[in-house]
Amino acid sequence: MAAKDVVFGDSARTKMVEGVNILANAVKTTLGPKGRNVVIERSFGGPTITKDGVSVAKEIELKDKLQNMGAQMVKEVASKTADIAGDGTTTATVLAQSIVREGMKYVVSGHNPMDLKRGIDKAVTAAIAELAKISKPCTTTKEIAQVGSISANSDHSIGQRIAEAMEKVGKEGVITVEDGKSLEDELEVVEGMQFDRGYLSPYFINQPEKQVAVLESPYVLLFDKKIANIRDLLPVLEQVAKSGRPLLIIAEDVEGEALATLVVNNIRGIIKTCAVKAPGFGDRRKAMLEDIAILTGGTVIAEEIGLTLEKATLEHLGQAKRIEVGKENTIIIDGAGDAKAIEARVKNIRVQIEEATSDYDKEKLQERVAKLAGGVAVIRVGAATEVEMKEKKARVDDALHATRAAVEEGIVPGGGVALIRAMQGIKGLKGDNADQDAGISIVLRAMQEPLRTIVSNAGEDAGVVVNAVQASTGNNGYNAATGEYGDLVAQGVIDPTKVTKTALVNAASVAGLLLTTDCAISEAPKDESGAGGMPDMGGMGGMGGMGGMM
């Protein structure tokens, strides 16, 4: 086992705080609409340019072991905040640095670190309660776009794309981010339920220019076995033909005589039909057929429930407004299923997601929820170079998480103002002793720091702006993008409540751990002088006479 260096008290804390400051100073340059870029060297390829706080934090490893410990603890604040809320990493880092810096002054002057931490925790709890009071729901497309824009470093096109995607697929829908093929950002939305199975015969195509079969107001027959004999299908086909509506058949397979008869009837115009294979395999296929049945208001024809094809009636068939069947995909738009039944099914799948152990199962279940709840949207990020693409994609991911957080827990005024307003919940707070009171005052000071940093990055006087914002009320604050004071919510400068809360809680948690640290153990540096390498080879000089051996 390698030897360790053990450092106690102020010596340990001082070094760790140095590490905190190095990391936080690098990260906080990116905060706010006028935050600066950070250039990161790569061992191969060009450097990466980013304005994403967590990307900067992840790159920092310090040579000094104790400094690195401090830096890694604050890095944990950034990454944990990103995991939970998807944004607020830079705010969390700035808050942590401030709590550590102010707290260290009290620790050095002899205050009890444990009571300081208790005071910090009390203040944070009160601030969170105040934030909940300030918060208002985020419901409109405009507000969602504003949250996305702020999180994507004031890129309004990204916010707009995310808002459009959420509007189209709903809050439960799946939104994915992919590399684009052009310079512009693109949004592709798959409405309704899509599954990866296409028509079993090209003779079902009724729109040759698009190579698709489109069925308007069709019935949907769901069967969990193969259909080979047309006699089994005849009773239900006759009923559908009388109704004059088209029919989509989804079964394990349709082959032989049954498929040939369907094709002939389709070509002759007797009954407009299309047949596709059921999606998935094994148990997943049964579950997906059941999903389609609930979405369309039909029943899966299965022997397990005592139903056979011959006994099937129109009541057993699902219905939809429109179905498009391509070579490889089928899209069911506006199924006629009962909304409450769909909601219950979604809840049931959510329970399965929580209980699932493998990531693959979770992903597949999540897809099923999205298909039932609204649809799938793909945002394709456009950029001129690969470096720009990576940087932009990271910002789109951040913005997407932030908008989800906003929809989930509401919004507060941005620009550091929410924390200034939340100070109202702490001002009357008293601790059990003077040390706890000191902990409360540490948090009060720290809650000004994000605003100070935003203003400093914009090149203005932080002290003047902080005093002006504290003197104002409600949503009024300083808009660093325009350099003007005003109602920030009306101007679209808003943050998700969850992001601000998570940043404060995580920052206080790690800062409290640092302040109550009294011993740091790190690996001792290896003694280079002892490693002399190979013994002296001076005696080899006599080999000069070996020339005669040639």
Curated annotation (Swiss-Prot):
A Gene Ontology molecular function term for this protein is:
ATP binding
Cite the binding residues for ATP. Answer: 30-33, 51, 87-91, 415, 479-481, 495
Keywords, A to Z?
A: ATP-binding, Chaperone, Cytoplasm, Isomerase, Nucleotide-binding
| One GO term describing the cellular component | cytoplasm
Say if the entry is tagged with keyword Cytoplasm: yes
Q: Kindly give the SUPFAM superfamilies that the UniProt entry links to this protein.
A: GroEL apical domain-like, GroEL equatorial domain-like, GroEL-intermediate domain like
Reaction catalysis annotation: ATP + H2O + a folded polypeptide = ADP + phosphate + an unfolded polypeptide
Xref: InterPro entries: Chaperonin_Cpn60_CS (IPR018370), Cpn60/GroEL (IPR001844), Cpn60/GroEL/TCP-1 (IPR002423), GroEL-like_apical_dom_sf (IPR027409), GROEL-like_equatorial_sf (IPR027413), TCP-1-like_intermed_sf (IPR027410)
* Major subcellular location class: cytoplasm
Enzyme class, top EC level, equals: isomerase
Listed CDD domains = GroEL
The listed locations are: Cytoplasm
Coiled-coil spans are: none
Role, per record: Together with its co-chaperonin GroES, plays an essential role in assisting protein folding. The GroEL-GroES system forms a nano-cage that allows encapsulation of the non-native substrate proteins and provides a physical environment optimized to promote and accelerate protein folding.
| Quaternary context | Forms a cylinder of 14 subunits composed of two heptameric rings stacked back-to-back. Interacts with the co-chaperonin GroES.
Q: What is this protein called?
A: Chaperonin GroEL
Provenance organism: Polynucleobacter asymbioticus (strain DSM 18221 / CIP 109841 / QLW-P1DMWA-1) (Polynucleobacter necessarius subsp. asymbioticus)
